[in-house]
Amino acid sequence: MEPEREGTERHPRKVRESRQAPNKLVGAAEAMKAGWDLEESQPEAKKARLSTILFTDNCEVTHDQLCELLKYAVLGKSNVPKPSWCQLFHQNHLNNVVVFVLQGMSQLHFYRFYLEFGCLRKAFRHKFRLPPPSSDFLADVVGLQTEQRAGDLPKTMEGPLPSNAKAAINLQDDPIIQKYGSKKVGLTRCLLTKEEMRTFHFPLQGFPDCENFLLTKCNGSIADNSPLFGLDCEMCLTSKGRELTRISLVAEGGCCVMDELVKPENKILDYLTSFSGITKKILNPVTTKLKDVQRQLKALLPPDAVLVGHSLDLDLRALKMIHPYVIDTSLLYVREQGRRFKLKFLAKVILGKDIQCPDRLGHDATEDARTILELARYFLKHGPKKIAELNLEALANHQEIQAAGQEPKNTAEVLQHPNTSVLECLDSVGQKLLFLTRETDAGELPSSRNCQTIKCLSNKEVLEQARVEIPLFPFSIVQFSFKAFSPVLTEEMNKRMRIKWTEISTVYAGPFSKNCNLRALKRLFKSFGPVQSMTFVLETRQPHLCIQYEVLEAAQLAIESLDGILVDGICIKVQRPVTELTLDCDTLVNELEGDSENQGSIYLSGVSETFKEQLLQEPRLFLGLEAVILPKDLKSGKQKKYCFLKFKSFGSAQQALNILTGKDWKLKGRHALTPRHLHAWLRGLPPESTRLPGLRVVPPPFEQEALQTLKLDHPKIAAWRWSRKIGKLYNSLCPGTLCLILLPGTKSTHGSLSGLGLMGIKEEEESAGPGLCS
């Protein structure tokens, strides 16, 4: 089973080497591993720095992964695992860590007011998407467990759970009772609704990231006597992310009907043996592929089958399959504040079973699948009231406190606790954390001997205190608070964002002769990149073409290459539609091209399926090449005819662009405009009908009214003011400071907004020099 979700003086650290992290670029070729190793061995590289590329699934970094990086920044590789999603070279040369949290802001804020966020986006080369926050974002990021969130950090607690634990509980306050009531429920009541499946990221038909997923074809009617099947999968880490290595399916009664090892399609970087139990020796002789187990699973499941799993969304995504009827025991046994009980814990306290024992090599997928099924049957048999009376929350808290037990005395002891928080890591090396926030903010860190909390009356006071206090602490968290978008304004801004990016990726071309060669024209415009649609406009005296491209780079390349040329003796104009959403598109394009994340990236159109191999055969021509990003068609899986190349520097990228668009390669290209995480976000927005390009839009009333009264606290003004203020504060930090800017996103009953993270090391890049926001 996969891992489940859930004093100011500085001490010198030992010199540590950096290790190669796996490349998880979606649709990318393997990065130049040898190049990294060579670079890492150079003696002159004595400054802490980050890898140029991030290894993230769907360009998203989870809160747990952020915590990985922060703990590694404190302790280094000798004491905690390296972060799985980025490389931090020369960690021992870091001087400070500073995290700025902009509560109330999201990725929508950043791209809706992209021009206003100029200081921050220019300073930080690394940007990544964050999932919507839980009710306690800060605690998630620093890795605090439940009992550490509300008050003082525990010191020690021994002995059994107090005898009055059950008597003290108010059953009506138990989240299980609040969701299911106190009476027994049938199987259908335990199924996740479609809305819940969407919320918890289950693969669903019609969603952009699931277009190549297979349906199980289980579409029969569901009743309380429908058959249950326990499912558990194990994964490994490949060059394309996590891939399936084992699947176990258990039918009611405990009979294992399927237990298969699976050979991943891509190169394996990490077998994740401690979780999966899979080793190279075990997997070497295996010939079964993902398509084989997909076929087998479809044949095994009856039309009314209900799949039961623990964090089942991860298993279905590994299988690349969509199933409509699911029970997830990590959600069935509801826990407070959106947290989840571990399978090992539920097995022990509900069933009296010991699973996932530390003396075994990895997890037993069949045992886990059988346990999951038993937990579902127990819930159905005994009902929510029986579960609530067990007081699982108190038992879990007591167990976690006992696990935390002895306060770490040194870093070796920290290693024994995988759930160690950033605070405990700092304490183990005798360091202290500064937490600056407003008095009215909900998110807090617990009081402890190594956490100095300073509460202020306003964002302005937080900023003033930060200037004074940050240099005194090795690790600082500075939290600002802003008013989140209302649900109505959020919906309007989402719609306008979708329309805006459609329109700036659309061009009108003409006039053309009435006898023009339409086939040749289509071929010409398609040569600049993937075309979403192409239509003739006949409203004008002479014909025009309207071309909507998939990517902004293709539209810009068409304008730059064709505007003003002669076609059949007629001078044509190639331009974007002019609406209030595209009036500043020239400024926006210039700013996107100058974005620090796009420095060193180029876009190419007309690449063949063998392009990557040809490219890698000419290493001397393309010095500094770090990644080849080859997008694939979601339906067919075929490589598209465009790509992005990422280089170490702008100069290397420019040299490569000159070569690749020259007479020998004959490709079309330009510098990149849109970073990967932006592509992923726009692709993931819910489908929405858009107006025809060129038609006038009446601004939605809420945003129109807000924009006409640009008050000091308006998001547009706030983005500009605080981007400059935080940018100036960043410029004042000492060299070698790891800095993260986190826009956590928002979560409410009306919907969720993804967050955004920006990351850099002070003076890591030239663009982060002084005067950036002066």
Curated annotation (Swiss-Prot):
Residues 1-19 have a biased composition (Basic and acidic residues). Residues 505-579, 600-679 form the RRM domain. One of its GO terms (biological process) is rRNA 3'-end processing. Residues 228-376 form the Exonuclease domain. GO terms for molecular function: exonuclease activity; RNA binding. Gene3D superfamilies: 3.30.70.330, Ribonuclease H-like superfamily/Ribonuclease H (3.30.420.10). Its EC number is 3.1.-.-. GO terms for cellular component: extracellular exosome; nucleolus; nucleus. Pfam families: RNase_T, RRM_1. The keyword Repeat applies. It is an enzyme of class 3 (hydrolase). Residues 1-22 are annotated as: Disordered. Keywords: Exonuclease, Hydrolase, Nuclease, Repeat, RNA-binding. PROSITE patterns: RRM. This is RNA exonuclease 5. It comes from Homo sapiens (Human).
